[in-house]
UniProtKB/Swiss-Prot annotation:
It comes from Allorhizobium ampelinum (strain ATCC BAA-846 / DSM 112012 / S4) (Agrobacterium vitis (strain S4)). This is Acyl carrier protein. Gene3D superfamilies: ACP-like (1.10.1200.10). Carrier of the growing fatty acid chain in fatty acid biosynthesis. It comes from the Bacteria. GO terms for molecular function: acyl binding; acyl carrier activity; phosphopantetheine binding. One of its GO terms (cellular component) is cytosol.
Amino acid sequence: MSDIAERVKKIVIDHLGVEADKVVEGASFIDDLGADSLDTVELVMAFEEEFGVEIPDDAADSILTVGDAVKFIEKAQA
């Protein structure tokens, strides 16, 4: 797992209080990890702060899984 993926995983665990083994690439924040719409907004804000990237609202709407977040951040930092 990449450094970005590890950091995303830690943020998700900290914000949602889920077990580490549930935070996998294909895990949906809402369907698999129990996040609600406020949780997803808070996650996006945490990703922006942690990685120093801006995630526009339209992009945030397409970040549905842990893997989506990792891919967006990797692309934004490239």
